[in-house]
Amino acid sequence: ADDLTTLRNGTLDRGITPDCTFNEKDIELHVYSRDKRNGIILKKEILKNYDLFQKSQISHQIAILIHGFLSTGNNENFDAMAKALIEIDNFLVISVDWKKGACNAFASTNDVLGYSQAVGNTRHVGKYVADFTKLLVEQYKVPMSNIRLIGHSLGAHTSGFAGKEVQRLKLGKYKEIIGLDPAGPSFLTSKCPDRLCETDAEYVQAIHTSAILGVYYNVGSVDFYVNYGKSQPGCSEPSCSHTKAVKYLTECIKRECCLIGTPWKSYFSTPKPISQCKRDTCVCVGLNAQSYPAKGSFYVPVDKDAPYCHNEGIKL
């Protein structure tokens, strides 16, 4: 789970602050492909001549997944997303496991004292991802236009830091960053240099699902406010709503339905009815969002159960 709930409730355990010190050597990469469906774990030092990154394999679209606070690179929701990406679109999926820096060892105690440490670690992990991207581009000749980052919670901001760093390294921009309910605590007043921002990739898509644990302002080219972005159907805990962003995207990848975003100017305005949606005004959440011309804020109605469709049969 990626659970910041007690941080907001102020019920901090005043025990010993956990040690979530970042060390690049602790990072593992879980790599999934059609012939490695259950994933294999790699360390950075063997990446330079790893046969999985042959030309045939590396020519595919690549998705780099980045988890959040208290989580791991092979958490069940990311595992389901990785499998959907390889099954449906034959992606090469690389999930960045920075669990020590994300305080996963303390997840069972729901200890949030390490949160500020984890926040600080996001920049280091972002740099790691950018350096790994440099290897893909320079050694394996992967075009930047083939690489997208998908980050949940703190992982969304980490993706933003990676996006800034690859530009600093003169590699260009990632094709896309998808921020899944980007973390709110410690980022509530942050400006672009210190969080995920629409300039961090060619296209930045944000899916907002919890106003308590996520940011409640626009960060992307498109910002989807699912069920108004406050909380999600069927969820009583903020952590459930926070995690729903991952599940929604996985269903969108499976293409069983289009979660339609309809223009929504501000919290005090009424969104345009889905029935009035056209391809040039509304946007489908997911990997093809970039193919729609509209930008800005969108309200997304959803059902309680997967595949969460609530689009009145409208086809965009």
Swiss-Prot record:
Reaction equation(s) it catalyzes: a 1,2-diacyl-sn-glycero-3-phosphocholine + H2O = a 2-acyl-sn-glycero-3-phosphocholine + a fatty acid + H(+)
One GO MF term attached to the UniProt entry: phospholipase A1 activity
Residues that span the membrane, as ranges: none
S-S bonds: C20-C103, C192-C197, C235-C240, C257-C284, C258-C309, C277-C282
Record-level GO BP terms: killing of cells of another organism; lipid catabolic process
GO cellular component: extracellular space
Alphabetized UniProt keyword annotations: Allergen, Cytolysis, Disulfide bond, Hemolysis, Hydrolase, Lipid degradation, Lipid metabolism, Secreted, Signal
Signal peptide per UniProt: 1-4
Propeptide cleavage-removed residue intervals: 5-14
Listed Pfam families: Lipase
Superkingdom in the source lineage: Eukaryota
EC number(s) per entry: 3.1.1.32
Localization of this protein: Secreted
EC main group: hydrolase
Family recorded in the similarity comment: Belongs to the AB hydrolase superfamily. Lipase family.
Protein task: Catalyzes the hydrolysis of phosphatidylcholine with phospholipase A1 activity. May act as an allergen and induce hemolytic activity.
Protein name: Phospholipase A1 3
Lineage, broadest ranks: Eukaryota, Metazoa, Ecdysozoa, Arthropoda, Hexapoda
